[in-house]
């Protein structure tokens, strides 16, 4: 039976990631004040054909996201200017949409997870996560984003059909 590691190493996951990310100029935004952390994640994703953007803090990330929508954001909790929690709350309030937000942080207490989810993150990972799991979560995020877009479009089509039917 194939494992997740087998799928990633054989290129199966890479092909799926590329297919899910193909429609976007930028597929994943990595938000972390640690240059090395951003580079490591960015390089791993770029090797899989994923288009990656980088921001050093939440304020910079919000500016970027006001200009361009991104299917997946990976955000650290502790950053100067605007931390990951404040970023997520502002992002969800100002730019509601289909973006999947993954909190990737060193914080790992139960109340930290709860606070992250309350702020609006979709997924919560602790730093040091094995690469196959990170890739799988990004894959899940891209897939979830795709489903959210399809649902939004289906709702809009249904509303239009209902208005036409009702003559409004």
PLM region descriptions:
Residues 54-72:
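Acidic, metal-coordinating helix/loop segments flanking the phosphotransfer/catalytic sites
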Residues 1-27, 153-168:
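Non-catalytic signal-transmission and effector/linker regions of two-component phosphorelay proteins
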Residues 39-43, 47:
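Charged docking surfaces used in two-component/phosphorelay signaling
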Residues 79:
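Receiver (REC) domain active-site loop signature in two-component systems and cognate sites
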Residues 128-142, 146:
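C-terminal output helix
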């Amino acid at each position: 039976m194939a494992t997740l590691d087998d799928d990633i190493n054989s290129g199966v996951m890479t092909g799926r990631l590329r297919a899910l990310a193909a429609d976007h100029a930028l597929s994943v935004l990595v938000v972390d004040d640690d240059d090395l952390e951003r580079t490591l994640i960015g390089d791993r994703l770029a090797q899989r054909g994923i288009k990656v953007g980088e921001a050093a803090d939440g304020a910079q990330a919000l500016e970027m996201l006001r200009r361009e929508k991104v299917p997946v954001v990976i955000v650290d909790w502790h950053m100067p200017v605007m931390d990951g929690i404040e970023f997520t709350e502002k992002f969800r309030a100002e730019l509601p949409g289909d973006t999947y937000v993954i909190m990737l942080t060193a914080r790992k207490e139960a109340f930290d997870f709860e606070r992250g989810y309350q702020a609006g993150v979709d997924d919560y990972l602790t730093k040091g996560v094995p690469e196959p799991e990170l890739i799988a979560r990004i894959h899940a995020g891209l897939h979830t984003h795709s489903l959210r877009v399809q649902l939004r479009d289906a709702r809009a089509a249904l509303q239009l059909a209902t208005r036409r039917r009702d003559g409004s």
